[in-house]
Design a protein with these regions (language model features):
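Amphipathic alpha-helical recognition patches that constitute DNA-binding helices
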Residues: 15, 55, 84, 88, ...
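Membrane-interface helix-loop-helix regions
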Residues: 82-90, 96-151, 183-212, 273-282
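Short hydrophobic/aromatic helix or loop-helix immediately within or flanking a transmembrane segment
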Residues: 126-134, 157-158, 162, 315
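Alpha-helical transmembrane segments in multi-pass integral membrane proteins
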Residues: 1-16, 23-26, 30-51, 66-83, ...
């Protein structure tokens, strides 16, 4: 299919990071659709150890935004002006809000007309529109896939302000590690304080894994990676392979160490270690600048579609469950294939019709 239906790839993109995004969205879509493969010939593939896709997205957000702000401060005498902050906010809004609000509306309409099951009374729409649905307490039964967006949104809001405040007292090289450490300690402390709410896997998922206060640390691990890349470039390049190997080993350890419900490891540090393992992959992958094959081009285009895919995949499978339940139940492998095709098709339409026009507008804001 020619250039994946004309999705343009900017040659300035770093292919290694595109690959990481593609892996992330594969893990997310696979994770939500793997139940279709249970009790089929492909059942064994559901047990393959894969990273949490959201961990990767969090690390990527912190790394890219951190890299941008550190470079700006170093080239502007450690000063972050009002215009830079307002420009960043405008570009962020144009990147996140169109897809997010459009899919929020679609979710609401599908629930309202009983196409999918959901509860808009317990968690009103305004909380989702203001990214306050899971700041310190969880939500469920509506727009499930939105949970990670408030984590990123509030990072984007406050991160520049921290730079403005802290730059009055020190250079970024000195205060960024402490800022990152603060949020790691903050998230771990929050999870420990919420331990009484965790009585089963579901409560762990919504209280520990899907609240802003619990997951904000993951993005700051990405910021720390950006700090290391900027201030220690020789070591960043020299130890890339070693860091990648350590990251794989740490990831393997998170799959081997028992995560007993209620344990200190499970409640307090598992999410930190899991994100750190992903962060260790970044030094090597940033060295992979470009691709030379059609497969590489396809991977970069999947990376471009990843935001749309993230917001639509749960909606697709929930709608398919309602519209064709017998097909979903009795034809698992085929249904899984159809699920992927529909996710790609719907994501492409969302990207072309909603996301791309605003991204083009965003590029005019410098």
């Amino acid at each position: 299919m020619k250039n994946f239906l004309s999705i343009e790839v900017d040659r300035k993109r770093v292919f290694g990071l595109d690959l990481l995004r593609a892996v992330a969205i594969f893990c997310v879509v696979q994770g939500h659709g793997e139940r279709l493969l249970f009790d089929t010939a492909l059942d064994r593939f559901t047990d393959l150890p894969v990273p949490h896709g959201v961990d990767i997205f969090f690390i990527m957000s912190g790394f890219l935004i951190g890299k941008s702000f550190i470079s700006y401060l170093e080239s502007h005498n450690n000063r972050l002006g009002r215009q830079k902050i307002l420009t960043f906010y405008a570009r962020t809004a144009l990147r996140i809000l169109p897809n997010y609000l459009f899919i929020l509306l679609v979710n609401y309409l599908l629930v309202h007309f009983q196409v999918i099951v959901g509860n808009t009374k317990a968690f009103p729409i305004w909380r989702f529109a203001t990214f306050t649905q899971n700041l310190f307490t969880p939500f469920w039964d509506f727009y499930w896939e939105s949970w990670s967006l408030p984590v990123q949104w509030w990072f984007y809001i406050f991160f520049p302000l921290f730079f403005v405040l802290l730059s009055r007292f020190a250079q970024p090289k000195k205060y960024i590690p402490w800022l990152c450490l603060f949020f790691v300690v903050f998230s771990i402390t929050f999870r420990l304080s919420m331990a009484d709410h965790v009585t089963n896997r579901f409560s762990y998922d919504v209280w520990m894994r899907k609240t802003v206060a619990s997951r904000i640390e993951n993005i700051y691990i990405g910021v720390l990676a950006a700090w290391l890349m900027h201030y220690f470039p020789k070591q960043w390049k020299r130890y890339g392979i070693l860091c990648f190997i350590l990251g794989i080993a740490l990831f393997a350890a998170t799959r081997i160490i028992p995560r007993n419900l209620g344990s200190f490891y499970h409640n307090a540090v598992y999410l930190t270690i899991s994100a750190l393992s992903v962060g260790l992959w970044v030094p090597l992958l940033t060295r992979w600048k470009s691709y030379k094959t059609a497969v590489g081009g396809f991977i970069s285009r999947i990376s471009i579609l990843s935001y749309a895919m993230f917001l639509t995949n749960s909606l697709v499978i929930l709608t398919m469950d309602t519209v064709c339940p017998q097909f979903m139940h009795h034809h698992g492998v085929l249904a899984y294939g159809v699920y992927w095709i529909v996710v790609l098709a719907v994501s492409y339409l969302l990207h072309i019709l909603v996301e791309k026009p605003f991204v083009q507008l965003r590029e005019r804001i410098k």
